[in-house]
């Protein structure tokens, strides 16, 4: 049995967008990526997994990614928690309890699900409430709605570290597909 991760089939535009995101992560100094699968970020997860510049740790719960990345901070390892919108929404307690209480920076990537174009009705609540929820707990985020915004990733990571607080980069499907 081959343990190599299978790279999802991607268009050239999607490969280009994924590569750009990966390069921005490397430029940020990220060394560890903890991820929970989401179909929109599967190509990004696969690319990070195959890239020797990163240690990729798949997790089975979003809170595990929060704990792993928070612990990595104390070990001096720049990290990223990578998950879908619903996963991020389930970890709000862990983020406020651990990262807010102890001023631990946490850099997160999430998808913006449940918006126009997302065919899955079970993600509607994500589209309605994700950014409002983040605003309600004063968790800084920026929405990547066009390709040029990908280049802001290193600045967002630096901001997160300077504040000693979490920060989220939220991607639209169009950006992840290389269509925006």
Each PLM stretch: what is its role?
Residues 2-180:
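Thiamine diphosphate
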């Amino acid at each position: 049995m081959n343990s190599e991760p299978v790279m999802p089939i991607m268009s050239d535009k999607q490969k280009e967008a994924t590569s750009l995101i990966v390069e921005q992560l490397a430029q940020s100094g990220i060394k560890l990526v903890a991820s929970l699968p989401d179909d929109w970020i599967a190509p990004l997860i696969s690319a990070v997994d195959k890239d020797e510049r990163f240690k990729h740790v798949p997790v089975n719960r979003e809170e595990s990614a929060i704990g792993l990345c928070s612990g990595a901070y104390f070990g001096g390892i720049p990290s990223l928690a990578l998950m879908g919108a619903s996963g991020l929404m389930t970890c709000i307690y862990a983020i406020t309890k651990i990262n807010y209480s102890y001023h631990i920076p946490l850099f997160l990537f999430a998808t913006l699900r449940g918006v126009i174009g997302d065919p899955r009705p079970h993600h509607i609540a994500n589209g309605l409430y994700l950014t409002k929820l983040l605003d309600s707990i004063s968790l800084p985020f920026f929405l990547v709605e066009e390709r040029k915004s990908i280049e802001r990733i290193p600045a967002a990571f630096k901001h997160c570290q300077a504040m000693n607080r979490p920060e989220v980069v939220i991607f639209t499907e169009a950006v992840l597909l290389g269509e925006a």
